[in-house]
Amino acid sequence: VDRRALLATGLAVAALGPGAFAQQPGPPPLKEAPPSPAPYSRLQGGGFVHHLEPAQEAQRVFDSPAPKGPEGRWTTLAPLPLPRSEMAWATAWAGRMHIIGGYGEGRVDRAYHHVYDPGTDLWLDAAPLPRGANHVAVAAHAGRVYAFGGFIEQNRNPDTNAYAYDVATDRWSVIAPLSRPRGAAAAVVLAGRIHLIGGAGAPTAERASVGWHEVYDPQADQWTMRKALPGARDHVGCVAYDGVIHVIGGRFNTFEYNTDLHHVYLAERDTWEARAPMPTTRSGHGLVVYRERLFAMGGEAGILTRGVPQQAKVFGQTESYDPKTDTWQQHAPMPTPRHAVGAAVLGDRIHVAGGGAVLGGALQSAVHEAFTLA
């Protein structure tokens, strides 16, 4: 079986050619995944957590330095089936949100694949990622959800694996691997191709941010190189809008060295240009396109001294960028600050699910909140 072997729940079952997805019979409907019994859980030692401790609550930050815009409002929706963080940043296809991999239930290499249906306010179980990992990069295009790289250990040991999930058949296939291992990269679709930007690579012991910029062609199953991101960084926010790619925020190696940098990639010239920086310097935030603006929410910052958080911040700020005026403004913050969230737009709402409730990976969240402008 070659690298395009079809994977159903992680098992190779048939050889696959470039157009074979459409030939596969459709599976039964995805099964409902019951909601988590508690909003949080611990990575170490296990166990659900119903309330944050005062010291954990103190990490929450809500105030933005940006000028005020329309408030908007947040609502609480069905929680994830279990508390999760450090998963793929989330992507949407056909009106549903897909959240893949990450930390959960005491492990950092989960293969979870949960799908949210806004019409029923239910989470569904989909075929798991063939190999569990955290900080996987994901993007959706032409009926498939693509997953690239990730870490096998806790924010360490990057991977080269790449997979495509066929939404119509609930099955994964192996596609051309990354040329170099990396996790916490950003994946975004532009003109039918998937750009994989930034992230962190080897060595395992001393994780290092990278500015690598590679482009995957789904038709040819091939990778090509493009101009590197200025300022190698990971845990960025990344979206494509109006023919350009925006890369905003992130970190240089660790959350102690976050940045507010904002660059756009101009594909026709294979070059990068600077734009107005993000008002709140952060990494591990969500970034989506909503009503012709770029909305950033969540994230983290701080210092870890021998594993103990110092100056820890978990952000609730919601800020939006107007590409026409190159300006930012603030909106109502997330009620539950989190980082490493899954964020996607479904209909006229921004959905933010899961994420870390405290600095680092100690506490996962099942919280699911949605934002809309009046």
Residue positions per predicted region:
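Kelch-like beta-propeller repeat domains
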Residues: 24-374
